[in-house]
């Protein structure tokens, strides 16, 4: 029997999206000071490459009463 060109073997596409992890740091206020909000949007790595970023820091002072 002659095999046609349409007779193919399709392998399943499998992969892992890795892990998504991150910490939002800490938010603290002491004597009228809005501390710092810092965190890191961890990394998403897998067969689709990697995406990583950091949300810097936000800090300010309300002064004292």
Curated annotation (Swiss-Prot):
Record key words, sorted: Repeat
Annotated protein name in UniProt: Precursor peptide TigB
UniProt-listed NCBIfam families: RiPP_TigB (NF047709)
Domain of life: Bacteria
PTMs per UniProt: Is subject to maturation by TigE, that catalyzes the formation of methylcyclopropylglycine (mCPG) residues from isoleucine residues residing in the repeating TIGSVS motifs.
Organism: Paramaledivibacter caminithermalis (strain DSM 15212 / CIP 107654 / DViRD3)
Gene: tigB
Record PTM Methylcyclopropylglycine, positions in chain: 17, 24, 34, 41, 48, 55
Its job: Precursor peptide which undergoes post-translational modifications by tailoring enzymes, leading to the mature natural product.
Each TIGSVS motif repeat, start to end: 16-21, 23-28, 33-38, 40-45, 47-52, 54-59
